[in-house]
Amino acid sequence: MIKSALLVLEDGTQFHGRAIGAEGLAVGEVVFNTSMTGYQEILTDPSYSRQIVTLTYPHIGNVGANANDEESPSVQAQGLVIRDLPLIASNYRSEESLSEYLKRNNIVAIADIDTRKLTRLLREKGAQNGCIIAGDAPDAVVALEKAKAFPGLKGMDLAKEVTTAESYSWLQGSWTLEGELPAAKNESELPYHVVAYDYGVKRNILRMLVDRGCRLTVVPAQTPAEDVLKLNPDGIFLSNGPGDPEPCDYAIRAIKTFLETGIPVFGICLGHQLLALASGAKTTKMKLGHHGGNHPVKDLDNNCVMITAQNHGFAVDEDNLPDTLRVTHKSLFDHTVQGIHRTDKPAFSFQGHPEASPGPHDAAPLFDHFIDLIQTYRSSAK
């Protein structure tokens, strides 16, 4: 039986459609993502915690869903907004339809609305709080009240909410078209020990580090630096994650300690912002944020352009950079800072997602730079 659904933004704009997920209510910051595919990876990206994701590509759900394409143990997005859900999901790897997947994970979603109109509204006014109600006779008054009551992501520390509860080891490399996910590698095949802070880490980041010879110990976001240093890591990885970086004082404090040791540090997304804050820079909330797999970024060191995957609502403020930081990458959309490198330490970071999943792989060599820093560090420590 087809159920109704309603999306109401905090400015009162209403979108009426049909429910394709669970019945109920979802409240969060409404953003749009321009990726043409990879909807399951987007939904399970912890960076989307407390956000309702609008996918601008009109046909979503064509290839169904499967367990291997998940980037975290559960769906992380608060809700989903799409234009059209195909009648049939067709792919040899599909285990269930997108609608079945959403219902099983208790995710509220709406289809059959004008996503072009919604996207243009968000582009002009900026990301807005919103509420989706799915079920019999959704109440617009209730939806508007819920949307207005949502506090927004500014000042919200979500890393400690989405992080792992316990440390764990990760030894699995990347998936290939030839088969299923590979078995975990032997530790003897992985010469570098990297501690990865989980602020909302995506699995493909871990896989790409393993591909480059790293055996990983993934630790909770609030793990003290002293506990990590006892593990004698060759490098420290700072993961992606949701929310505002400024309230994450525990992470900033730990990163400051690591910078004093000379251990190589590599940050992505939220980890990039945290490295900047630990180095004395500032961050700001963006009007729109960057969400999609087609964002051009200029590599200032090599004078080339990369097409990158992006997912962030905060940015490093270039006007407040200390002398110890230099800008390595800039967005060609809005000229915001996309990469930084310490001038005095083996530490660097990137705002986008070089692991893609979904998205292009132009920025994957950043992982290789991390390995180069690790090798230099190990050589100097002998």
Swiss-Prot record:
The keyword Ligase applies. PROSITE patterns: GATASE_TYPE_1. GO terms for molecular function: ATP binding; carbamoyl-phosphate synthase (glutamine-hydrolyzing) activity; glutaminase activity. Residues 1-189 are annotated as: CPSase. Pfam families: CPSase_sm_chain, GATase. CDD domains: GATase1_CPSase (cd01744). NCBIfam families: CPSaseIIsmall, PRK12838.1. This is Carbamoyl phosphate synthase small chain. It comes from Pectobacterium atrosepticum (strain SCRI 1043 / ATCC BAA-672) (Erwinia carotovora subsp. atroseptica). The gene is carA.
